[in-house]
Amino acid sequence: FAKEVLKFTNNEGVPAVFDGVGKNTFYKSLECLKIRGMMISFGNASGPLDPINVPKDIQPKGLYLTRPSIAQYFTNQKELQKGADDVFKKVKFGKIKIKVSKEYKLADAKLAHEDLESRKLTGPAVIVP
């Protein structure tokens, strides 16, 4: 995909990449970035990242790399509770719509966990009574 992105951008690259896949796409995502581009790596769907060689992988194009997690956005219980309250209020009033990709019966909870751990799920899943 990096070659296609570079072709589409006349070899300039894109200003930012949001990569939630992880190991399988990380280095190709870096290739897509333009000079001083921003790599936002936020997931490990294909597995954890290999160690990053900053002089080889980041420095040549002066890239910026961030790996945000919820811990940086909510630094204490009060902030976390407020954030959760805000999200649930938006869900309740239809400002955020959640499409459940799979439902499991409570009796199938073990299967739900196995599917989650083996990365078979693509989206929110719920266990129902």
Predicted feature locations:
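Terminal helix/beta-alpha structural elements that buttress the NAD(P)+-binding lobe
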Residues: 1-129
